[in-house]
Amino acid sequence: VRQTDIAGNTSAATSFSFTLDTSAAAPGVALTTDSGSSTVDHITNVGTLNLTSVETGATVEYSIDGGHTWNTSFSATEGVNDVQVRQTDIAGNTSSATSFSFTLDTSAAAPGVALATDSGSSASDHVTNVGTLNLAGVETGATVEYSIDGGHTWNTSFSAVE
């Protein structure tokens, strides 16, 4: 930039450079670990997120209430987590939000076990001539394993022995 005054004198040039930044891209969001039997079902026992396309120096914000409030940190809770993520770059541009949903499941309840038939002289003495078990509380998709040696070895099938 330079100027010429009304007397016809031209100043030395002043250099000035700047970067015009008018937008911020929405960040990519994925689970850090999608654990369990499927690596793409968004069910995990680790509730941390992996963000991509975050600009250097940008502030990342999370919303768990549909975008009404935003925070700079996020902690997953047991069960379904619906989170939105956005970034505000160093120029002050705020991206659109990326929505991501996943289920955090950090524990499996012990299943209930009972004899299918307690045929002994008492219906509650666990003496039977039918070695079939009934299970309760097994989660859909869970793998059931049996141990007959105090938990040293486990198998997915069970056959009662006399």
Model-derived regions: residue spans:
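Low-complexity, disordered linker/stalk regions enriched in Pro/Thr/Ser/Gly
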Residues: 1-162
